Every structure is written in structure tokens, then in C-alpha cells.
Amino acid sequence: MTENVSAAQPAKAPAAKFGGKGLTIAIAVAAIVTVAGLALWVFQLTGGMVNTNMRNLDSWGLYITMFMFLVGLSAGGLIISSAPRVFGVEGFGGISKIAVWTSICCTVLAIGFVVVDLGQPLRLWELFAYSNLGSPLMWDIIVLGTYLILSIVYLWAMLRFEGGKGSATGLRVVSAIALVCAVLVHSVTAWIFGLQQGREMWHTALLGPWFVSSALVCGVALVLVVVIALRRAGYLQLDQKHVVKMLKLLGVFVLVDLYFFGCDLLTEAFPAGSGADIVAMLTTGALAPFFWIEVLGCAATAMIAFTPKLRTNPLIVLAAVLAIVGIFCKRVQLLVGGFQIPNLDMPAVVSGPGLADAGAALQSAGGAMVYFPSPLEFGVMAGVVGLGALLLLLGLKFLPLKPTEQSH
């Protein structure tokens, strides 16, 4: 019988003992997928980026889309972990360590997608040797690296505090620094796109706060899915009131995100200029499926969050998954849509492997999807995601992430 959680109720007893053969099999599968993805990446390196479907008109693709998406997942998880400590309010039932470990795994994945997007990763050192500190790309490299280190330090500080070796004040200071960095990392990622004047769809001051709201949506949603799954597997016991609290928080963040989306659409469409073409592309053009999946999925998430009778565990998981999928669709719209809009008057452009007439090439770019990932890109993506799953499972098996009486 489905559990109704419209009001706070004691959590059910764990269905099974966590670990054992099932966990070992899951770790093995994740490791195999990771190795397979690594092999495909080596193939990509030996053959060059021509093996992908990224070209001059669409120089960023699936890898950078996943980078944006995973930065959001990581930032959102750390924010909901650190904010209760910083502001001295009740947390979510001792899930802070799990949320932070999830954030660390997502950050590693985000960095991994940047690496696989490099045609020559052995030249990574040149980013630091010849760095341009006036570039948002360099800002993001610095902030993302700092963020990963801070996340690890924050987890270490929580473990020390629970072991009686740290002070509450020190942990709160680390929490505050981590919270600021979590907001900053997603803002800087947004500025990579928002400060590009040549891309009309990206060039908006709204992009920074919009990215932060999206991070909160998918971060809370991911933590919801993880903790419900772990409770089901017997890893932790979590009172249902904390699940409901996170669901309500997710509903608020979803509404804020949809509000930002509506403001952006109205600002672009109302003058009836070139911005109207962007809105048409999103609502009825090549990107319409992603647009409507996001809007309808996030609306359904909000409805489940604010309707007590719908707060059953299966629907809570569905709401969280819809929110995650919706934010991913937004990332696809942003990145691919930015390249759909021609931004230069050129006598000719390189489209694919050959030289094409500018009019025909740009018409093709605007009339249909200018980019769709190759099977190789999907394979490499699966390998990187497999690495994240492997890290998450290993952490659950070997790290003391379960709640204790001192967690909150």
C-alpha cells in the first residue's frame, strides 16, 4: 500500500540491510561502464574531435551541457547541506554528509566533462601557464577547483566534529565559506555564457541568479532521490517529515525558476524583434520538445509538492526526477539554442567538413537542430557518469556517511 506523507509520520523500518552482494554488483557494473567510457575517450583522442558531431557552428555540445548540469547538481546539494548550519535552523535529519558526498561526486564529474571536451588534454597545464585572468573561463577553473577542495574540507570537518575533535563554531565557519562558494561557482558558470555579447540568447543579466535557482532545484531533487533510495535500501532511517520538508523546498525553488524563465521569455518576445525568433524556436521550433518537457515537468513537480494528498513516496520520487530532467532540458535549450541563432554576417562558413554557402548553412542551422551528439559522445558521457556512480557507491560503502546523533 502506498504511503501517504501529507503530514509528518515516523519513517518505516528499512526494507533490507544495505550492502552485501547487491552493492558489490552495482560497484562492478559502474566500474565496467567507466572503463568502457575511458576506452571510447581514448578512441576520441586518437581520431580527433571530428569523431564527435561538434563543428564550427556548434563548438560546444553534450560534454559542456553535462558540465553545466552537474555543476548545478553539486552546488544545490552543498547549499542544502550547509545553509541550516550557517543560519542555525533545523536541518533535514542528518543527511548533510550524504548531500556533501553527492556534491563532491558531481563536481568531479563536472571537471571530468571539461577534460573530455578538450581535444588535447595533455595541454591542460597551458591553462595555468598562460592563463588569462580576465576570462570567465579562467574564473570558473579557479572557483570550481576551490569549490571541490572546500567540499572535501567541509566533509572532513563534519566527520571531525562528530568524532569530538572539532568545534561547532569552526564547523559553522567552514559551512559559511562553503555556502558562499557554492553560490559563486554557479554564478561564474553562468557568466561564461552571459558575458558573451555575440550570443543574444545568452547575453542577459538574469543568467546568474537563474543558474543559482536551477542549481537549487536539481540539487534538492537529487538529494531527495538519493536519500529515499538509501532509506529504502536500509542505509539510513529518515523521518518522513524531513522528506516532506525537502519536497516543499523543491516546490518553492521550482516556482522561482519558472518565474525567471517567464521573465526571460517575456523580455525577449515583447519587443517583437530578434528575441521573438528565440521564443519561437523554443516554443514551436527545433527545441520545443525540451521546452515543454521542462515547463510541464516542473509544473507537475510544484503540483505534487503543494498538494498534500499527492505526497506519496513514489510521487515524491517522480517529482524529483521530473525536476532533474526539466533542468537538464533547460541546459540543452541554453547551449544548443545559443548556437542556433546566427551571430555573424559572413560571406561563407565552414559547416561540417566542407565549405558551404552562408545562406544555406545558416538557414539549415536555424531551421533544424544544428547539433545532435554522436554515438561516441553518448558513450563517453556514459563512462563519465559511470565514474560518478562508482565514487558515490564507494563512498557509501567505505565512508562514515550515515547520520549520527550529532548530525542535524
Model-derived regions, located:
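Juxtamembrane membrane-interface segments at transmembrane alpha-helix termini
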Residues: 109-110, 136-140, 328-337
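Alpha-helical transmembrane segments
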Residues: 39, 81, 154-155, 303-304, ...
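Hydrophobic alpha-helical transmembrane segments
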Residues: 68-72, 139-152, 215, 286-299, ...
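N-terminal signal-anchor module of multipass membrane proteins
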Residues: 1-76, 80, 389-393, 406
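Membrane-interface interhelical loops and short amphipathic "cap" helices
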Residues: 40-64, 116-138, 164-166, 190-211, ...
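Long, contiguous internal "core" modules enriched in hydrophobic/ aromatic residues
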Residues: 13-34, 89-91, 129, 133, ...
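Membrane helical hairpin/interfacial module
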Residues: 58-122, 139, 143
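TerminUS-proximal long segments
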Residues: 3, 314-408
